[in-house]
Amino acid sequence: MRPTGWRWPVLSLLLVLLPFQAAGPPRPRAAWTRIVSFLTCALTALAASWMTATRTLSNEITHCLTLTRLFRRYTIVNSWLLDRSLREAVLPSKTVTRMAIDQLWWPRKYTSTNGTIWCWGGGPSGISCRWIRINTCASCRTADPSGNARVYTVARPQPPTCCSNGRPRPLFRTFRYRTLPYLINPKRANNGAGPRQRFRNVYPPRLATVSLGRDGNGPVRGISSSPTRLTRPRMGGNTLRVSRTFGPVPCIVPEAKPWTPRVKRRCPLGATSRRLRPQARRGNVCACVVENGYGTAGYVPAAARCRLVRPPVRSTTRFST
């Protein structure tokens, strides 16, 4: 549809005002540079979509927004452009939709009329998006029976656990750590690989995570290129190292059951298997305890420099093995 008459000034005004619909104060670093880059890209996309009918205008502007990295500082709520393009791209997919968008290295949340869309990833593999329905009730619900997208209802008053068959599961998700040093506790240079794995500066607190170390088989060891599946890592040695990729994550339960990798050593640093809780013990595996923002405990595979840290006494999160 070509803009004629009053549509041209309205669309031009929309392109100018769209980057300023911010949910919070913008960062002062290179703010005008990114806005000018977005306007240049958006005007080019508008002219291209006006002359050719190959792509829709909403997809072009969405691509310009992500390409100029305005999502790092701006959260556009209930935008018809993002709502339309992302819902069309995410909801019909049964797995994970990947779009060829570079330079987006952090999960972003887009609030639409039907729920919340989380996008994460970046680099050569592209960006992945998921639609998650948020509910304010305290009860735990199962997945959406439609099966188009693995939709889970998250209970906000409770700790961040996804629901599967009415039972909560611990939330372990991995994202790349690149340009967000403020998420890591500056008092611990090893980033949680020491005796006490506590992360006080993780934002937001209800979405803490831990990953398993890097590998050539994917972005991180133990996590394949698809964020919804867990794969067995290639064991290069007898220990696993906890990498430095921590950050907020969407509450998505992997399709496969939680898998705990085995190590040849019985327990690191003299820890014995009888000191472990039954939920964390599988054969000769020693697990370390990581606390998320709410203080509830979760178990990760044993690391070479990791000691056993007992979980809080009052822990409301149930772990399914």
From Swiss-Prot:
Keyword Lipoprotein appears in the UniProt entry = no
CC terms in the record's Gene Ontology section:
extracellular region; host cell
Keywords from the UniProt entry: Glycoprotein, Secreted, Signal, Virulence
Q: Kindly state the positions of the motif RxLR in this protein.
A: 84-87
Check the UniProt entry and state the signal peptide residues, or none.
Answer: 1-23
Location of region: Disordered: 210-237
Q: Which residues are glycosylated?
A: N114
Q: Where in the cell is it found?
A: Secreted; Host cell
Question: What is written about domains in the entry's comments?
Answer: Has the canonical translocation RxLR motif, but lacks the canonical EER motif, which characterizes most oomycete effectors identified so far.
> Per the similarity annotation, which family is this?
Belongs to the RxLR effector family.
What this protein is reported to do is described as:
Secreted effector that partially suppresses the host cell death induced by cell death-inducing proteins.
Protein's UniProt name = Secreted RxLR effector protein 71
> Which gene produces this protein?
RXLR71
